[in-house]
């Protein structure tokens, strides 16, 4: 019997958990309330901060609580172009300006948005990474659904009541700069999680990985593996529908999506 492989150890958590102790908090939209459903609420950008382990900067936005005499600070994913002291408007009747939060159904077709809700009230789940954005393609007023194009290129039908931030996530072009040296990768992943450096399976011994061993580094068996394989064998291309390069014209690929 071989050893417990890396994938099995990761499932147990422990040293493989995300490094979250030093992070600034969960970046989400406001809880949806009466003010956002029927009008708008005004907030002000107090600060733009770096969140360790995240490529995009965060914005601290202060709102007056509509129900109590107090102020609430929310952490938003910063849209490119916002600045400290800027007013942010959230709600159905807010204007279509960079950084404002509106329901997708009120936006014209072709609007570029980020931090988009997947389901109404989930406070932003899609297009959140630095430089990412989704595009509003079309609306169907009868079914109250909207179609959006996600950063992956796939198109998704969502409720028109889903909110989104107008604009592109700040920090774009981050991956254009090459890492160049191992020390930078070390510090990058130290802030994120314990996943670096990653030893290839074919470079291991047979006891440590199903692809290990041999007089030269080769897998020696099909890299595809069935879905119900035991955990110690489930490595490679798990339950792959297809393998290899995407061949053919772009139009064919779009039809598949």
UniProtKB/Swiss-Prot annotation:
It holds the Pfam family Ribosomal_L2. Residues 207-230 are annotated as: Disordered. GO terms for molecular function: RNA binding; rRNA binding; structural constituent of ribosome. PROSITE patterns: RIBOSOMAL_L2. Coiled coil: none annotated. The keyword Ribosomal protein applies. One of its GO terms (cellular component) is cytosolic large ribosomal subunit. The keyword Ribonucleoprotein applies. HAMAP family: Ribosomal_uL2_A. Belongs to the universal ribosomal protein uL2 family. Component of the large ribosomal subunit. This is Large ribosomal subunit protein uL2.
């Amino acid at each position: 019997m071989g050893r417990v492989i890396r994938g099995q150890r990761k499932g147990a958590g422990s040293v493989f958990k995300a490094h979250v102790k030093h992070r600034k908090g969960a970046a989400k939209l406001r809880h949806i309330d009466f003010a956002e459903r029927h009008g708008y609420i005004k907030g002000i950008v107090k600060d733009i901060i770096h969140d360790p382990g995240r490529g995009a900067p965060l914005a601290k936005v202060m709102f007056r609580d509509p129900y109590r005499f107090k102020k609430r600070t929310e952490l938003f994913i910063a849209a490119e172009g916002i600045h400290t002291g800027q007013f942010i408007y959230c709600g159905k009747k807010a204007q279509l300006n960079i950084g404002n939060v509106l329901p997708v159904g009120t936006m014209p077709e072709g609007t570029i948005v980020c931090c988009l809700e997947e389901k109404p009230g989930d406070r932003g789940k899609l297009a959140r990474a630095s430089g990412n954005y989704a595009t509003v393609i079309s609306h169907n007023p009868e079914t109250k659904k909207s179609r959006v194009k996600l950063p992956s290129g796939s198109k998704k039908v969502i409720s028109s009541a889903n909110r989104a931030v107008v604009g592109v996530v700040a920090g774009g072009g981050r991956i254009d700069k090459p890492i160049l040296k191992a020390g930078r990768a070390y510090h990058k992943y130290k802030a994120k999680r314990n996943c670096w450096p990653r030893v290839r399976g074919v470079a291991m011994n047979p006891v440590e990985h199903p692809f290990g061993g041999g007089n030269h580094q080769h897998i020696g068996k099909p890299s595809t593996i069935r879905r119900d394989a035991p955990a110690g064998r489930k490595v490679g291309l798990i339950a792959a529908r297809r393998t290899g390069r995407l061949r053919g014209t772009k139009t064919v690929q779009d039809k598949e999506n």
